[in-house]
Amino acid sequence: MLEQIIATKKKEIETLTLSKPLQNVQRRSLSAALKKPNRSIGLIAEVKKASPSKGLIRPDFHPVAIAKAYEKAGADAISVLTDERYFQGHRGYLSDIKQAVQLPILRKDFIIDRIQIEESVRIGADAILLIGEALPAKTLYELYQEAYDKGLECLVEVHQRETLENILDIFTPEIIGINNRDLHTFVTSLETTSKVIPFVPSGSVIVSESGISTSHDLKTVQTYGADAVLVGESLMRKDDVEAAIYELFREVESIAGP
């Protein structure tokens, strides 16, 4: 499936046109937000309408309202799907959300070309996702440098230890995401975090992604050593996403108050 998505993305890039830059954009640091989270573990809450493996996740989809509810519930950052073909996302969702909340915005897409980085800047992203299994390590590093040169941060995602080690042979990402879902098979296991995390350098922020739907799951990856989690589907399936965040953290820790 990953190969199919990348092939589609390459075709899309051939006809990609850049929009005018969003005006008066204030950049917000994803790494800083995750290093000083509202709770004992950081939360990147995801705005996602659909996925290739699960189909339509949220028919009643109002991205800005969802993002505002996430912010109210104490999320540290917001991830926005912008891939249209497979996730029913849109670049406009990210721009609208950027102008509505005061949190760092992660662009969740399949970034494989420099032009997508410029596009990310223009639509208002604060950070982008770079997928280790989708790119040669050298190419990923070049895109990483390009992003930081343009004022964006990167969440570098891996699923396997081997992918991580290939990247670490070249550089150490500031934020490393461990995807518990295999993007080739879509099989998900939280054990992936436990297997990969011992090989992550101590200075990197560690984000556990996918398969986190209960407070028990949250505690599990926190025990493994994750600094933050990225949660999408389990929140999006709840009518009240604000309440869903409180429920997710119920057994971990209540939100820090005044």
From Swiss-Prot:
UniProt KW Lyase keyword: yes
Pfam family, one: IGPS
EC number: 4.1.1.48
Pathway: Amino-acid biosynthesis; L-tryptophan biosynthesis; L-tryptophan from chorismate: step 4/5
Enzyme kind, highest EC tier: lyase
InterPro entries, per the entry: Aldolase_TIM, Indole-3-glycerol_P_synth, Indole-3-glycerol_P_synth_dom, Indole-3-GlycerolPSynthase_CS, RibuloseP-bd_barrel
Lineage: superkingdom: Bacteria
Example of a GO MF term: indole-3-glycerol-phosphate synthase activity
Catalysed transformations (reactions): 1-(2-carboxyphenylamino)-1-deoxy-D-ribulose 5-phosphate + H(+) = (1S,2R)-1-C-(indol-3-yl)glycerol 3-phosphate + CO2 + H2O
Entry similarity comment: Belongs to the TrpC family.
HAMAP family named among the record's database cross-references: IGPS_B
Family annotation (NCBIfam families): PRK00278.2-2, PRK00278.2-4
Identification of the protein by name: Indole-3-glycerol phosphate synthase
Organism: Geobacillus sp. (strain WCH70)
Gene: trpC
